[in-house]
Design a protein with these regions (language model features):
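Ribosome-associated RNA-binding proteins
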Residues: 1-162
Length: 162
């Protein structure tokens, strides 16, 4: 559909998903209780090691010091990215009551970010509620190779994401 609609001459120019970034941030007061469960939850969902993220700036109002651990993240590419993307479309998004309301003026055409407020929607974590109940929301960023907004929306509509 993309080839017919946008008249691509080369297969390299066809827009596709580049990578998916999953990130969980923790508050400074909660860091000791939630750091190990957040890392473990991402590893259970994706079967991949997570990396710790550090704060780049200090903020005295939030009691954050520069260089302290904030949370953890995983970057997905290639097969694992598509596996997670289809799992997200087929399993997780139908469970969410809210639909995505997207403003065409504020969205960037290269990436799309949203958050899942309850991480317990994943089937791998449902049975272990007592271990993962204190985890904050999951930030998901999907990065594409689209050149304009029309390609971006058409790409996600072909995946039936919107």
């Amino acid at each position: 559909d993309l080839i017919n609609k946008f008249n691509y001459t080369k297969n390299v120019n066809i827009p596709k998903l580049k990578k998916i970034i999953l990130n969980i941030n923790t508050t400074p007061t909660n860091i000791t209780h939630c750091l190990i469960p957040t890392m473990l939850s991402l590893e259970l969902i994706l079967l991949k090691k997570s990396k710790l993220t550090n704060s780049k700036f200090s903020n005295l109002n939030l009691k954050i010091k520069k260089g302290n651990v904030n949370g953890c993240k995983i970057i997905l590419k290639k097969k694992k990215m598509y596996f997670f993307f289809f799992k997200l479309i087929l399993d997780i998004l139908p469970k969410i009551n809210k639909r995505f309301v997207i403003k065409k003026n504020t969205i960037f055409y290269k990436n799309f970010s949203f958050k899942i407020e309850t991480i317990l929607m994943f089937s791998e974590l449902e049975y272990y509620y007592k271990f993962f109940k204190n985890i904050s929301f999951l930030n998901i960023t999907i990065i594409t190779t689209t050149l304009n907004r029309y390609e971006f929306f058409f790409l996600f509509k072909t995946f039936k994401f919107f």
